[in-house]
């Protein structure tokens, strides 16, 4: 997964830089969100793996599916999924047509297809969202601990992360008893493992090296 995130990083940055400079972050994020769902579909995966289908045809197919889903005035599965993630959405919007993919988005998709990187779109989407959060000076930190965090621990972790990242940090908590003690912190594709389990793994690696 880390390797895929690394491969996706330059594409996500290029997409976000363009979207940010041209004030179209929402349009690009909507496209990448739906495209991630399409690319994850088993039938689409088979199409991507078919050598008889050209890169141009694959790109056109993805854009066509997106346009069909969002420009319809009827409720469609992917449009409903998109609207359900937007807090400002009301029921009437599900029957409204949304904008089709722009020429710039189409060009981006064709570049991905030519470089055989369409399968990276889910990772591009996640990286794009990370860039957006950073641009807004807001970072999501996923903290997994062996036991539920106390309020004091939560505040301490958040304060240290905000001082380090120079940004507002939103803590997402999870509990994993197998960590034994301590915690892991994941931000984007970066993971800091300060758990006892992680330290034991490091020790084992050193002893067997």
Curated annotation (Swiss-Prot):
It is a peripheral membrane protein. Belongs to the ATPase delta chain family. HAMAP family: ATP_synth_delta_bact. Keywords: ATP synthesis, Cell inner membrane, Cell membrane, CF(1), Hydrogen ion transport, Ion transport, Membrane, Transport. One of its GO terms (molecular function) is proton-transporting ATP synthase activity, rotational mechanism. F-type ATPases have 2 components, F(1) - the catalytic core - and F(0) - the membrane proton channel. F(1) has five subunits: alpha(3), beta(3), gamma(1), delta(1), epsilon(1). F(0) has three main subunits: a(1), b(2) and c(10-14). The alpha and beta chains form an alternating ring which encloses part of the gamma chain. F(1) is attached to F(0) by a central stalk formed by the gamma and epsilon chains, while a peripheral stalk is formed by the delta and b chains. The keyword Transport applies. This is ATP synthase subunit delta. InterPro entries: ATP_synth_OSCP/delta_N_sf (IPR026015), ATPase_OSCP/d_CS (IPR020781), ATPase_OSCP/dsu (IPR000711). F(1)F(0) ATP synthase produces ATP from ADP in the presence of a proton or sodium gradient. F-type ATPases consist of two structural domains, F(1) containing the extramembraneous catalytic core and F(0) containing the membrane proton channel, linked together by a central stalk and a peripheral stalk. During catalysis, ATP synthesis in the catalytic domain of F(1) is coupled via a rotary mechanism of the central stalk subunits to proton translocation. This protein is part of the stalk that links CF(0) to CF(1). It either transmits conformational changes from CF(0) to CF(1) or is implicated in proton conduction. It comes from Psychrobacter sp. (strain PRwf-1). GO terms for cellular component: plasma membrane; proton-transporting ATP synthase complex. It comes from the Bacteria. PROSITE patterns: ATPASE_DELTA. Pfam families: OSCP (PF00213). It is found in: Cell inner membrane. Coiled coil: none annotated.
